[in-house]
């Protein structure tokens, strides 16, 4: 209850702040994902970032250090795609529960040609076997 009162007080004190959603009836989700390879100087873990838009309105975003060290920039980007695909899957389920039909397929934008090729290639090699689970997850969501 205390947390709810705190939120209400914050909203009352800051009436001009907020995220504005553009008007329109588009139901197209667009997702953008990116990562930086080995950015953390202490752990050499990459940082994943993604954002999801419904039409022109930003509805979800996240930036987080990856759980494991990536051995290539393509692997770091691919893990970013997997995190983004998981968020998009959750958002689609949420919108279905709310009775909102989302246009499929969802556009996912990634700036790594290598990560896109890994997602599209049905054959695993020794160099990509360790990201096998993420790869299957992304493939199920984007194909």
How would you describe each model-predicted region?
Residues 1-143:
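Divalent metal-binding acidic/histidine catalytic loops
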